[in-house]
Amino acid sequence: MSEREFLRFGDELDVKNCNTSRSFNGLLMAIGGIIGGTAGMLIALIIAGFMNFMSYWFSDKIVLSMYGAREIPYEEAPWLHQIVEELARRANMPKPKIYLVPMEQPNAFATGRGPGHAAVAVTRGILEILDQEELKGVLAHELAHIKNRDVLVATIAATIAGAIGFLANMAQWALFFGGLNRNEEEEGGGFAEMIGAILMIIIVPIIATIVQLAISRSREYFADETGAKICGCPVALARALKKIEEYVMQVPANVNPGTAHLFIENPLKGGGIMELLSTHPSTEKRIQRLCELARKMGQECI
């Protein structure tokens, strides 16, 4: 990919990020309208505004605290900080903070609202199974997400998914207490609203999945390519993805499904319907693309 193509694709991603965020907010308001009419839409609008505000300013703290991550001081792992510093220099971006997640499953993610306010988190497991070249590939992939501002959109998606779940709970309580604006004179309308609320409660998990899938798989492909160019070794990233996938299938992780799309490899991977609805492209396809890039760079693939 030429520099001009790289910049043009980056501009396209900025537009896509904006459109995706608007779509999430619109989806939330539509669900609020179905559940509670005008009042429901107003509540959904307030929730969306609050969630977006929280996502923008506190997304890194929310996600990191969710997984008990702690910041790694330079003195504890100078080699790791040096790797991130070098990669950030190559990517022409500020060095993000580095966090350790006390999780045995090998994985990593990035969070934050932009290059100047971001963090990269690695699990204990990934530090144990990858060599330094492979780890460079993983960290470069996460820096690519930060540079492309994928992290902000992904975090907004996670918070909107949570808000959708909140609205579903509202519908359940409304049904329980008969608070769906029914009265004796409008039994037909009240019945229709009740059926609509029941259907909404049933399909909310499906909608939450669609929200996650809206985080385009092309973002992962582009982050792989950009990360491989940053670290200079597509083969190392390909090896890392292969190792991580093998361990993810064997080592379970206590991960909130609403944040699964933040990780470099789907931490809930398990085949079947979950594989079909995965927020990530298949590892095999990602490796194939990295191998193609490696050959263009004169490297032998795995």
Swiss-Prot record:
Protein name according to UniProt: Protease HtpX homolog
Residues that coordinate or bind Zn(2+): 141, 145, 220
Pfam families: Peptidase_M48 (PF01435)
A GO BP entry: proteolysis
Active-site residues, record numbering mapped to chain: 142
Catalytic EC class: hydrolase
Domain of life where this protein originates: Bacteria
CDD domains in UniProt: M48B_HtpX_like
InterPro entries attached to this UniProt entry: HtpX_protease, Pept_M48_protease_HtpX, Peptidase_M48
EC code(s) of this entry: 3.4.24.-
Subcellular location: Cell inner membrane
Cellular-component GO terms for this entry: plasma membrane
Regions annotated as coiled coil: none
Alphabetically ordered keywords of this record: Cell inner membrane, Cell membrane, Hydrolase, Membrane, Metal-binding, Metalloprotease, Protease, Transmembrane, Transmembrane helix, Zinc
Cofactor annotation remark: Binds 1 zinc ion per subunit.
UniProt GO MF annotations: metalloendopeptidase activity; zinc ion binding
Cofactor: Zn(2+)
Broad class of the protein's primary localization: membrane
